[in-house]
From Swiss-Prot:
Organism: Loxosceles arizonica (Arizona brown spider)
Homology family: Belongs to the arthropod phospholipase D family. Class II subfamily.
EC number(s) recorded for this UniProt protein: 4.6.1.-
Listed name of the protein: Dermonecrotic toxin LarSicTox-alphaII1
Chain positions recorded as Mg(2+) binding sites: E25, D27, D85
Signal peptide positions (record): none
Top-level taxon in the UniProt lineage: Eukaryota
Length: 273
């Protein structure tokens, strides 16, 4: 999975897909009442990137729908996976459930069109930066189920993104009954070098049949760093330069071992690489 990083403006969706991304990540900010309001990263962010792009959340979700709705003029066949980087650290722990509810309400209305009409082809990963906010998952799932559309949860996965100890992450999932659809991230801003020790631990847990189904690293922009991540067996690389990863995947060491995920692939199915 080539995961385009910090795609917070609608016009950037097409830009990153054109560069080769089959997945995009964006930052979701909440107000003091736990409502998701807009996509925005802010300063500081990755080196050599603009940090200030933003859209209202409802408008961004509508754009995601257009890009993953077969028959729509803006439909992008190979755009498959969306990573919602949920900036919940601005909230109290007690607000996590409400944040999940309100996130579900927005996605159900603006991306899934209230469960009506032609289904969209995108899959979602809810990426949470705080292990204490596990109730966000519960709030999200219970809200979708209450709307009579539990089948939509087949298209939703989860990630805790704070580089916590893997056993602690697994315990958080146990608290809300999650046993699959788990992506595990590992990383740091592209301005700083980070080793792959924890990423390799996550890969081992994936291959050992644990709760982790997929592993991705962020934010990786250099050719050699991408090669190192692929050698470690990750499923996805989040990058500011999808075209660089496209070129790396064409190299002899990787062209027969990896292929780009397509819209017929299940982003929650475990592969041992």
């Amino acid at each position: 999975w080539i995961m385009g990083h910090m795609v917070n403006a609608i016009y950037q969706i097409q830009e990153f897909v054109a560069l080769g991304a089959n997945s995009i990540e964006f930052d979701i900010n909440f107000d003091t009442d736990a409502n998701p309001i807009y996509t925005y990263h802010g300063v500081p962010c990755d080196c050599f990137r603009s940090c200030l792009h933003y859209e209202y959340f409802s408008d961004f979700l509508k754009a995601l729908r257009e890009h993953t709705l077969p028959g729509n003029p803006k439909y992008k066949e190979n755009l498959v996976l969306f990573v919602f980087d949920l900036k919940t650290n601005s909230l109290y722990d007690s607000q996590a459930y409400a944040a999940g509810q309100k996130l579900a309400e927005n996605i159900f209305q603006y991306y899934w069109a209230n469960g009506e009409g032609m289904p969209v082809s995108g899959y979602l990963v809810l990426s949470i930066p705080n292990l204490q906010h596990y109730d966000l998952i519960k709030g999200f799932r219970e809200t979708i189920k209450a709307k009579g559309h539990s089948e939509l949860l087949n298209r939703v996965g989860y990630d805790f993104s704070a580089n916590d100890n893997i056993p602690d992450v697994e315990n958080a999932y146990k608290k809300v009954g999650i046993v699959n659809h788990v992506w595990q991230s590992d990383g740091i801003t592209n301005c700083i070098s980070r080793g792959l020790t924890r990423a390799k631990e996550a890969v081992s847990e994936r291959d050992g049949g644990g709760v982790i189904n997929k592993v991705y690293v962020w934010t990786i922009d250099k050719y050699q760093s991408m090669r190192d991540a692929l050698d470690a067996g990750v499923d996805g690389i989040m990058t500011n330069y999808p075209d660089v990863l496209v070129e790396v995947l064409k190299e002899d060491a990787y062209k027969d071992r990896f292929r780009l995920a397509r819209n017929y692939d299940d982003p929650f199915e475990t592969f041992k690489v």
